[in-house]
């Protein structure tokens, strides 16, 4: 309920999950880090799993020292949550949600929020990103996330070029089926 209330009152503009493996096609961690900084600045709560979380940690985004990167309303939320949790400081700007095999925790959270609001997941202000995805398991995961109704971004062009039908299905038609779509965008900003 508190998370939902903060989204409804505009203190949090939405929730983004960043996940995925590192890719040798881009500078290590930079897609995750650049995107996370932009999201935080715009008062979007960021959850991270797996290599994305580790990359953000390497750049200091999972501790209180990164609070200067956070928008005003999200900063207030993190400070309030930190006090409520008995910490002497704000909650970290990015919340670590576990290893890559724990991505389902984010789906459980999305489902619980949708159930609480008596709506479908695709109506929630949620997005997922595998900005540096590199292995086939990432494709299986992001297709599962899209099937739940969560629009998903990938930052490395996938090997989908064999069929215009498949490309159209993934980037356009899925929205008619699941309420969400696949966004392919290499620039993390």
Could you tell me what each predicted segment is?
Residues 1-189:
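Anaerobic metallocofactor- and corrinoid-dependent redox/one-carbon enzyme cores
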């Amino acid at each position: 309920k508190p998370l939902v209330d903060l989204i409804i009152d505009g203190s949090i503009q939405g929730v983004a999950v960043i996940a995925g493996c590192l890719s040798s096609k881009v500078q290590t961690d930079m897609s995750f880090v650049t995107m996370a900084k932009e999201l935080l600045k715009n008062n979007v709560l960021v959850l991270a799993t797996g290599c994305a979380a580790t990359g953000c940690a390497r750049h200091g985004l999972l501790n209180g020292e990164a609070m200067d990167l956070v928008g005003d309303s999200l900063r207030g939320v993190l400070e309030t949550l930190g006090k409520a949790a008995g910490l002497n400081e704000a909650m970290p700007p990015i919340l670590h949600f576990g290893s890559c095999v724990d991505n389902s925790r984010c789906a459980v959270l999305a489902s619980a929020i949708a159930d609480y609001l008596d709506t479908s997941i695709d109506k929630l202000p949620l997005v997922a990103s595998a900005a540096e995805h590199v292995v086939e398991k990432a494709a299986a995961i992001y297709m599962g996330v899209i099937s739940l109704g969560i629009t998903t971004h990938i930052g490395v062009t996938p090997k989908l070029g064999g069929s215009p039908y498949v490309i159209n299905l993934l980037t356009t038609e899925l929205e008619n089926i699941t309420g969400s779509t696949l966004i392919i965008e290499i620039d993390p900003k």
